[in-house]
UniProtKB/Swiss-Prot annotation:
It comes from Drosophila subobscura. The lineage of its organism: Eukaryota, Metazoa, Ecdysozoa, Arthropoda, Hexapoda. Chorion membrane (egg shell) protein; plays a role in protecting the egg from the environment. Belongs to the chorion protein S19 family. The gene is Cp19. This is Chorion protein S19. It is found in: Secreted. It comes from the Eukaryota. Pfam families: Chorion_2.
Length: 180
């Protein structure tokens, strides 16, 4: 039964992967350069979004600030359409010169994860550094408590020591040295 459940889960995962396709919506193959929307300068993210809006494209666009990466120009922003619906099969047609989605390339996260530190800003490689948790420090008042137990402290009367004569409570033995 365990093997059957594992095979069923793998089969469903393969079907879902074939239906939805991954990055890009229907009719868009992977990443799209900014130059295809009409502007090829190093203007920034705002200029990339405004050029996409001026070209009459009303679809939402995800802006990825990218440096030199394989297959793209130097210093261009990349606009990738955001897929809004997940219905039906994606009609992915590879664009000129590309082979569809290359799974190992491109940024894994376009939005920086919480608590991550940006290591290589030109390539969108985020590496998370987990800092040790800082706890709030509370200073508690320290006041002496009552003794836990009453300890017996002998007053230099070390029991019955018969070498020194008779017992005398006011006399301390073996403390001051020999008396003559």
């Amino acid at each position: 039964m365990n093997t059957f459940a594992t095979l069923a889960v793998l089969f469903c995962a393969c079907l879902i992967g074939n239906c939805h396709g991954g990055y890009g919506g229907g009719g868009h193959g992977g990443y799209v350069q900014q130059g295809s929307y009409g502007q090829r300068s190093n203007g920034g993210a705002a200029s990339a979004a405004s050029s996409a809006a001026a070209a009459g494209n009303q679809r939402p666009v995800e802006i990825i600030a990218g440096g030199p990466r394989g297959g793209y120009g130097h210093g261009h922003e990349i606009l990738r359409p955001i897929q809004l619906g997940y219905g039906g099969h994606s009609q992915r047609v590879p664009q000129h010169g590309s082979y569809g989605r290359r799974s190992g390339y491109g940024p894994r996260w376009t939005v920086q994860p919480a608590g991550a530190t940006l290591l290589y800003p030109g390539q969108n490689n985020y590496r998370a550094y987990v800092s040790p948790p800082e706890y709030t420090k509370v200073v508690l008042p320290v006041r002496p408590a009552e003794p836990v137990a009453k300890l017996y402290i002998p007053e230099n009367h070390y029991g019955s020591q018969q070498n020194y004569g008779t017992y005398a409570p006011q006399q301390s033995y073996n403390v001051e040295g020999p008396r003559y």
